[in-house]
Amino acid sequence: MPWLQVRLAISPEQAETYEDALLEVGAVSVTFMDAEDQPIFEPELNTTPLWAHTHLLALFEADTNAEMALAHLSLLTGEELPEHSAEVIEDQDWERSWMDNFQPMCFGKRLWIVPSWHAAPQPDAVNLLLDPGLAFGTGTHPTTALCLEWLDGQDLDGCNVLDFGCGSGILAIAALLLGAEQAVGTDIDVQALEASRDNAGRNDIAAERFPLYLPEDLPHQQADVLVANILAGPLVSLAPQLATLIRTGGRLALSGILAEQGEEVAAAYADSFELDPIANRDGWVRITGRRR
């Protein structure tokens, strides 16, 4: 059965208005999708997670007049519609188009992120199987990519790793597959911990190698490597705490930082770490260094 699919690029502030309006003009389903693989931070319980750049997908019966539906939508919202498109798709094509958004990706020399439904392009490589779920990080966002490439370039054999703000668990699981002995994950969101646990199981990671905690339950033990792909503000305020969680000589990688925020974040860590040059990609940066 074919469907009319309408896609709109919205902000989080527009989400409720457009969801209600689309349902009123006849949409049979409304779905929110992350436009940039931007991690979610501190979503409210029992609410729909939203991203800074969100795509809203609405499905209508195939015989719906797209122009009339969009005109009605504009009247209901009382504003000019944001960037949008409309097309008729088949059921099978709709599912395939969603899956086709997630192709295997290589990071560094060894590491591949592979959707669980896709064959690994290089079976002998380090392949991390991932199902994009609540969009806690799939590798497509520059901050995630910067961290994955850094991990791929490290000697992690026998290391203990702390993933602070673990989201999907992608960084911790990558570290384990790259040779780390254990990775600890912590996140403020129980949904993120569930996603991490599911993805660890998908990669045959035993639970004892990847314990997961809410921040208030995190044991105080020093890691050989700490990665934190969160936001600049929390990274600055957490700098003293994170410094205590890394042993002397241990390694640090921070991201989730806009280029214009890089110097401020680096300054917060400069007293405790010997910092490397800041790595930049598409307006985002990664800060790395060693604990003094």
Swiss-Prot record:
Entry's localization field: Cytoplasm
EC nos: 2.1.1.-
GO biological process, one term: methylation
Domain of life: Bacteria
Signal peptide: none
Pfam families: PrmA (PF06325)
Key word Magnesium present: no
CDD domains in the cross-refs: AdoMet_MTases
Catalytic activity: L-lysyl-[protein] + 3 S-adenosyl-L-methionine = N(6),N(6),N(6)-trimethyl-L-lysyl-[protein] + 3 S-adenosyl-L-homocysteine + 3 H(+)
A GO molecular-function descriptor: protein-lysine N-methyltransferase activity
Disulphide bonds in the chain: none
InterPro entries from the UniProt entry: Ribosomal_L11_MeTrfase_PrmA, Ribosomal_PrmA_MeTrfase, SAM-dependent_MTases_sf
Binding-site residues, S-adenosyl-L-methionine: T144, G165, D187, N229
Keyword tRNA processing included in the entry's annotation: no
Any one cellular-component term (Gene Ontology): cytosol
Keywords from the named record: Cytoplasm, Methyltransferase, S-adenosyl-L-methionine, Transferase
HAMAP family: Methyltr_PrmA
UniProt similarity note: Belongs to the methyltransferase superfamily. PrmA family.
Function: Methylates ribosomal protein L11.
NCBIfam families: prmA
Protein name: Ribosomal protein L11 methyltransferase
